[in-house]
Design a protein with these regions (language model features):
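Alpha-helical support elements that line or immediately flank enzyme active sites
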Residues: 1-14, 22
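C-terminal substrate-binding/catalytic lobe of Rossmann-fold NAD(P)-dependent oxidoreductases
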Residues: 16-19, 23-156
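Short, hydrophobic alpha-helical segments
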Residues: 12, 70, 97, 174-182
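NAD(P)-dependent Rossmann-like dehydrogenase/reductase catalytic/cofactor-binding core
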Residues: 142-189
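Short acidic/polar capping segments at secondary-structure boundaries
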Residues: 6-7, 26-29, 161
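A glycine-rich, Thr/Ser-enriched phosphate-binding loop motif common to dinucleotide/cofactor-binding enzymes
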Residues: 1-3, 54-61, 163-172
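Alpha-helical scaffold segments in soluble metabolic enzymes
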Residues: 3-7, 65-69, 170, 177
C-alpha cells in the first residue's frame, strides 16, 4: 500500500484527503507460528482450503502506518485475505480516474522513475496471461509494482513475498548502507 500510494501523494497527483480502499492476498506464513501449524496440520479444517478475509473490524495493525507514512488523512478501507499457500503477497489499490489528477500511463511514469530496482522495480505488466499471482516472488526479497485497468478504473498493484526481507533483511540493507555497499548486497532479489 505504502509503495503504491506514497509516490502519488508525493507527486501531488493523489490528494492526501483521498478516500482509498486496498485489498491484499497473502500466504499463511505471515500469520505466524500458530497459523502455519493450522495450515500444515494433518487435521486441517476444511475452512482453511479457501481464502479467508480478516481485519473485519477495520482495526488492522498496519492501518496506522499505511495512513501515517503515506500522509493521507483517512485510513483506507483495508481488506486483507489469507489463503492456502505458504508465502507471497499481492496488494491492490483500486482507483476511479476521478480520484487522481493524471492518467494511468502518467502513474506508470511516476512509478517507473521511482522504482528502478534492484529491490523494488516497476513492471509494465507482471501478470501471467491476465492473472496476477500472489506467489510470483515467493522466496525473494524483491517487489514488482504495476498499473492495470483502463481510462475509468485503475488498479495499482504490488507483488512481493510477505516474508520477504523481514527484519533481518532490513537490518542487512541498513548495514550495507552504513558500510557503503549496494543496499541489495546479500539479499535474494
Amino acid at each position: 500500500f505504502i509503495a503504491l500510494v506514497y509516490p502519488l501523494v508525493e507527486a501531488g497527483v493523489l490528494g492526501n484527503d483521498a478516500l482509498l480502499s486496498c485489498y491484499s492476498l497473502t500466504g499463511y506464513s505471515g500469520g505466524g507460528k500458530k497459523m502455519i501449524a493450522e495450515y500444515k496440520s494433518e487435521d486441517k479444517s476444511p475452512l482453511l482450503f479457501a481464502p479467508r478475509q480478516y481485519g473485519l473490524t477495520q482495526q488492522h495493525k498496519h492501518l496506522k502506518e499505511m495512513k501515517g507514512i503515506t500522509g493521507i488523512e483517512n485510513a483506507p478501507i483495508f481488506c486483507p485475505v489469507v489463503d492456502d499457500f505458504y508465502s507471497g503477497m499481492q496488494v491492490t489499490v483500486p482507483l476511479f480516474a476521478e480520484q487522481i489528477s493524471c492518467s494511468s500511463s502518467e502513474i506508470a511514469d511516476i512509478y517507473r522513475a521511482k522504482y528502478q530496482g534492484p529491490v523494488v522495480t516497476f513492471c509494465d505488466k507482471s501478470d501471467n496471461g491476465g492473472f496476477l499471482c500472489a506467489g510470483a516472488l515467493s522466496g525473494t526479497d524483491g517487489m514488482k509494482i504495476s498499473v492495470y485497468g483502463n481510462d475509468e478504473r485503475i488498479l495499482l498493484t504490488a507483488v512481493y513475498d510477505n516474508l520477504g526481507k523481514g527484519a533481518s533483511g532490513a537490518a542487512l540493507e541498513n548495514l550495507n548502507l552504513v558500510m557503503g555497499k549496494d543496499k541489495a548486497f546479500g539479499l535474494d532479489i
